[in-house]
């Protein structure tokens, strides 16, 4: 009997899906689609990797994807609603947003301190470039239409 117990297969259980938005983001990063991942691909990934009943959880997954797009966590590359292709937004890695904000603040401080004259020169150069691009073309001259000559018709005399 001890042999029968040891010969039983040990099956590994799929982890239960805990958070729909996080699972959706993880599926998008794991799928690594170049133009974003479709809803069908995301559903398939979640169904294979998590212990979820997709017919019951589909509404929650769609809602999580929509809210992820609204909050900026996901980027919607095509279509509308949740029936679209989506890509990973910069919001998932919050460090990226902080770095961008820090760069902007550093640039603003440099402009305030000593580069005020350089900023004015850059603004003047940008205005000159915009004016050069907006050259107005002269209206093309219209060709004169030939005037029809009117000829008098001779009346025929009846004899």
Swiss-Prot record:
Stretch list, region Disordered: 1-31, 80-99, 132-159
GO MF, one annotated term: double-stranded DNA binding
Keyword Nucleus: yes
Superkingdom of this protein's organism: Eukaryota
Gene Ontology cellular component list: nucleosome; nucleus
Pfam families tied to this protein: Linker_histone (PF00538)
One GO process term, biological-process aspect: nucleosome assembly
Annotated localization: Nucleus; Chromosome
Compositional bias segments (type: Basic residues): 10-22, 134-148
Biased composition annotated in UniProt, kind: Gly residues: 84-93
H15 domain ranges (all copies): 12-102
Keywords recorded for this protein, A-Z: Chromosome, DNA-binding, Nucleus
Comp. bias intervals (Basic and acidic residues): 149-159
Function text: Histones H1 are necessary for the condensation of nucleosome chains into higher-order structures.
Family: Belongs to the histone H1/H5 family.
Descriptive protein name: Histone H1
Protein's organism: Psammechinus miliaris
Organism lineage: Eukaryota, Metazoa, Echinodermata, Eleutherozoa, Echinozoa
């Amino acid at each position: 009997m001890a042999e029968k117990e040891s010969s039983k297969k040990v099956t590994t259980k799929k982890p239960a899906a805990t958070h729909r938005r996080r699972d959706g983001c993880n599926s998008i990063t794991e799928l690594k689609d170049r133009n974003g991942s479709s809803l069908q691909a995301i559903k398939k990934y979640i169904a294979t990797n998590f212990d979820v009943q997709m017919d019951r959880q589909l509404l929650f997954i769609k809602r999580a994807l929509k809210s992820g797009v609204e909050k900026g966590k996901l980027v919607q590359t095509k279509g509308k609603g949740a029936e679209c292709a989506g890509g990973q937004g910069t919001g998932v890695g919050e460090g990226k947003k902080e770095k961008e904000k820090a760069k902007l603040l550093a640039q603003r401080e440099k402009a305030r301190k000593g580069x005020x004259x350089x900023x004015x020169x850059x603004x003047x150069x940008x205005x000159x470039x915009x004016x050069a691009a907006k050259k107005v073309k002269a209206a093309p001259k219209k060709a004169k239409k030939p005037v029809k000559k009117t000829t008098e018709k001779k009346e025929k005399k009846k004899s």
